[in-house]
Amino acid sequence: MKFNLTHFAAASAFVALAGSAAAQTEIKIGYALAPDSHYGVAAQKFEEVVLAETGDQFSFKHFPSSGLGGEREVIEGLQLGTIEATIVSSGTLANFVPATGVFDIPFLFSGLDHARAVLDGPIGQEILGEFDTVGLHGLAWGEQGFRHITNNRNAIHTPADVEGLKIRTMENPVHLAAFDAMGAAPTPMAWPEVISSLQQGVIDGQENPLSVIVSVKLNEVQKYLTLSGHVYSPAMLLVSKPFWDGLDDDQKAAM
């Protein structure tokens, strides 16, 4: 009798453990930059905060350095519900929520304080809310800074120095139109292809905030840096709408 009770207790414990493990939800979070980048640090902090608030209800799996694909592919994964979260540059988001394209207008903001006030105010929060209509949920804006130009062809001192420059941009209509108006040759390209394209001379340069330029060591493949500050480029913490809709109120509050 004791033998049977012992095995029954063991079996019951196994079932309880299996049920607990099954109840834990995995959050896959993908981003374009390295684990030690500002994206990686932010993703780790997001995990720490969520786990501190929810205990063992969630587990996190990080996919840095475009481990789940380019930014557009990852966002589409969020819409499908196959990826739970991402930290992404706002420049990609105009393809999904056109209103975000307003932030890509060159020289729109006078400085960081101006940009942050708009993003944290009614305009920024209203745009965050629009993501719910396209299978996404915007949790928060994040800091990246102003975008600057790097290239291998020549130093840039005047607008004429940009003439004909093959510069990688995101697949963003405002970015493309702006560089086209300057006389450059804007080339939309997914981020995972950029470094090799610079090395092979497919493109002359690219433009990004200093946080990205430093993180990916563009100084190793580019000769010139121009502190143009032509566009303020916020990041965004996004989650999948199907994932978000499956959370209870306490879990949503933790995020």
Model-derived features with residue positions:
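Bacterial N-terminal signal peptides that target proteins for export
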Residues: 1-9
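N-terminal secretory/targeting leader peptides
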Residues: 10, 24-114, 122-254
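Sec/Tat signal peptide C-region and signal peptidase I cleavage site
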Residues: 17-23
